[in-house]
From Swiss-Prot:
Belongs to the UPF0060 family. It comes from the Bacteria. This is UPF0060 membrane protein Sala_0701. Its main location: membrane. The chain crosses the membrane at residues 4-24, 30-50, 60-80, 87-107. It is a multi-pass membrane protein. Keywords: Cell inner membrane, Cell membrane, Membrane, Transmembrane, Transmembrane helix. InterPro entries: UPF0060. It holds the Pfam family UPF0060. It is found in: Cell inner membrane.
């Protein structure tokens, strides 16, 4: 469930932020903000579904997933292919997220 919550949250957050980007930077209608706000609310809800004891750890691990998802958005939606440095950076971030999520915790 955690992986699906993180992936869904990342897509919802990026879509919500992109709606504001489209309105403010691409001269789209202010009505783009309406689904953007709904998407950002969905993002916040989905993060509550992550199986973790502490919100801060959930958010920290989510950061790596967000970075990887943002690069997929860059490619799939904006048509700009990530370069090797983007991919290396995303791999490092996902590694960090895995350490945060799966690292042994003292009692």
């Amino acid at each position: 469930m955690t992986a699906f919550a993180y992936i869904g949250a990342a897509l919802a957050e990026i879509a919500g932020c992109f709606a504001f980007w489209a309105w403010l930077r691409m001269d789209k209608s202010v009505w783009w903000v309406v689904p953007g706000i709904a998407s950002l609310a969905l993002f916040a809800y989905l993060l509550t579904l992550v199986e973790a004891d502490h919100a801060g750890r959930t958010y920290a691990a989510y950061g790596g997933v967000y970075i990887a998802a943002a690069l997929l958005w860059l490619w799939a939606v904006e048509g700009a292919k990530p370069d090797r440095w983007d991919l290396i950076g995303a791999a490092v971030c996902l590694g960090g997220a895995a350490i945060i999520l799966f690292g042994p915790r003292g009692g």
